[in-house]
Amino acid sequence: MSNKIMKTSRLTAEDINGAWTIMPTPSTPDASDWRSTATVDLEETARIVEELIAAGVNGILSMGTFGECATLTWDEKRDYVSTIVETIRGRVPYFCGTTALNTREVIRQTRELIDIGANGTMLGVPMWVKMDLPTAVQFYRDVADAVPEAAIAIYANPEAFKFDFPRPFWAEMSKIPQVVTAKYLGIGMLDLDLRLAPNIRFLPHEDDYYAAARINPERITAFWSSGAMCGPATAIMLRDEVVRAKSTGDWAKAKAISDDMRAADSTLFPRGDFSEFSKYNIGLEKARMDAAGWLKAGPCRPPYNLVPEDYLAGAQKSGKAWAALHAKYSNELK
């Protein structure tokens, strides 16, 4: 059977709304062994996708940092994306991830995964050599020119990509039609970036969504969620309450959910340090998810499979807190 799934026209920013969940790449028990060659649990992958769609998520992102884009083989990536596309069957939009170390490899992977059926790619810049602004801008222009049918989500993580994604960058990205959205960290410069990039749907982190939506209710209509991998009910509840608050002016419930999320995340970051967290991002996120019990993330692929035990304890505590929130808000959604 062909892996190809018929797609509609390229996504636009207007298609990006609601709760966008970022998936891990579930692993087999032997995934931490470098000798292993087929480490993706495809059955669990399909189950997670079905459960996310049943829960009501608006879109799915994959193969970012804790999605282990950096440590999957090309065969594993193709099998994983094929499974997701075949499971989704066009019911929600899906961005794969094709970040790599050079433009030609990014284009090759993007072409193949879009051909399989992904709607777009979540894409960071190559990071072996630190990029300046003109190089980063040209990189995205080249990918857009090479794969014009692919929607692009800018993966704006300064820690991962050694690039600050400065204000002029966003102004240039807004000129590329394929760039429709961005996985966005922090909201200190959000108001300015919204003005510089009027054609891009910025996705703040779920912890920041309430505050971001208050900054600009019309433009901020979607967010990215990793906590949903501990159970999606909290993210769905936040989405719905922000929509309601925009209509009624009563933001109290949305703020309460946001506060719950922040509290659950409080032990995830070692010493409250995002830079330290970023060294162990994959292991900490997968430990959080496994502790929550909603999915089976499985062991990390090498070389990123070593994490300090005390850091893991904080991640596991966070996962259990998110599991409690999922139970709480599942009852409220009934």
UniProtKB/Swiss-Prot annotation:
It comes from the Bacteria. Keywords: Aromatic hydrocarbons catabolism, Lyase, Plasmid, Pyruvate. Encoded on an unnamed 75 kb plasmid. GO terms for biological process: catabolic process. This is Trans-O-hydroxybenzylidenepyruvate hydratase-aldolase. Involved in the naphthalene upper catabolic pathway. Catalyzes the transformation of trans-O-hydroxybenzylidenepyruvate (THBPA) to salicylaldehyde and pyruvate. The reaction is reversible. It catalyses: (3E)-4-(2-hydroxyphenyl)-2-oxobut-3-enoate + H2O = salicylaldehyde + pyruvate. It holds the Pfam family DHDPS. The keyword Lyase applies. Belongs to the DapA family. InterPro entries: Aldolase_TIM, DapA-like, HBPHA/CBPHA.
